[in-house]
Curated annotation (Swiss-Prot):
CDD domains: AsxRS_core, EcAsnRS_like_N. HAMAP family: Asn_tRNA_synth. The gene is asnS. It comes from Histophilus somni (strain 129Pt). GO terms for cellular component: cytoplasm. It is an enzyme of class 6 (ligase). Coiled coil: none annotated. This is Asparagine--tRNA ligase. Keywords: Aminoacyl-tRNA synthetase, ATP-binding, Cytoplasm, Ligase, Nucleotide-binding, Protein biosynthesis. GO terms for biological process: asparaginyl-tRNA aminoacylation. The lineage of its organism: Bacteria, Pseudomonadati, Pseudomonadota, Gammaproteobacteria, Pasteurellales.
Amino acid sequence: MTKIASVANILKGKITVGETVTVRGWIRTRRDSKAGLSFLAIYDGSCFDPIQAIVNNDIENYETEILRLTTGCSVVVTGKIAESPAEGQAVELQANKIEVSGWVDDPETYPMSAKRHSIEYLREVAHLRPRTNIIGAVARVRHCLAQAIHRFFHEQGFYWVATPLITASDTEGAGEMFRVSTLDLENLPRTDKGAVDFSQDFFGKESFLTVSGQLNGESYACALSKIYTFGPTFRAENSNTTRHLAEFWMVEPEIAFATLADNAKLAEDMLKYVFRAVLNEREDDLKFFEKHVDKNVITRLKDFINSDFAQIDYTDAIDILLKSGKAFEFPVSWGIDLSSEHERYLAEEYFKSPVVVKNYPKDIKAFYMRLNDDGKTVAAMDVLAPGIGEIIGGSQREERLEVLDKRIAEMGLKAEDYWWYRDLRRYGTVPHAGFGLGFERLIVYVTGVQNIRDVIPFPRTPRNANF
């Protein structure tokens, strides 16, 4: 049986010239010469570039099938690897047998015909868009980054923990949650006071899709010392912007016996590790992004790796912004949450490097963040990167039960909803810290693709849950 070879392995020189192999993939383009030859560009998704197959007109099905091949048809091609005389490719496939696995019903109406399509149009055909250069490249980069994240944490002695997608806890206390219910919406059970009786629901209480795996992650960090979660999270935030998704993936490490400084160091080490990985492993895709999407993609990643992270207190950051002379759209004052324009000024213009802003006002941060001695700020941090602004948010967690209870009350939350989380402070409490990295935000930064809807396979946004 002939050896099955990926296009990537052939183009990387892992298949020797003269060897006969079978390539399985799809037609990107076909052109015919007057000399009785057809040139097929075949891709299989294993790398950015297709391989060129040279087809002679003496192949049995040349007239009946080869000359009918169009963009999108699937084929199984067997042939010999040969050095290519053409520019831009080292080898080609001299075909001696081609089987057509699947035809495109009507090439005239095929949504992915061989022409340039707008990124907006591609969102309307999300089930077919991975066949395009840009979305195929995004998918490979996404895979590379995910694998690098898992490798990094494994090498650092972390354990991966699967946290639940269905929860009764609001980690962020913002209330922007998707309710999970099996109740009959046309015949809702009611309490004596007329409220919906969730005790009759599937879980016996009001339940939601998770906004974060952090609280559950803390439980395991307080036993395994170093853990991370990596999975989908959900926010019912009615925002139709290039930066928001209703369903997205989060990377959330938690470390016991750790301070905010340990947290910042972990964030820096992780980001630099995954950026090195993508530069080493996905050079072909990054060159495409550099040429067609963002000319600074590769330079930005290399600069990030070679940068020392600046560190600054929130209060000092506000000072810098006030003295900048910039007319920001959102006015600056102590107590505000930094907007994207503020973050980018700090990273791109003032420090010209990644920067960790820490010790934020407690009133704009979550209840679980450790209260500082000043009583006004919490041990929170954001990692800001040139070109995007915030890329990571984290904190040292509040390990003191009495302080945690006070913060829960201040936020208008119910202590009984967090009984198990409070138990972690009652039984062998320990200083611990962690952060959250929005995975799609990371992909946006790496690829230069500006709309977050284009870096996740099937985006979920307000009034859009197609596919």
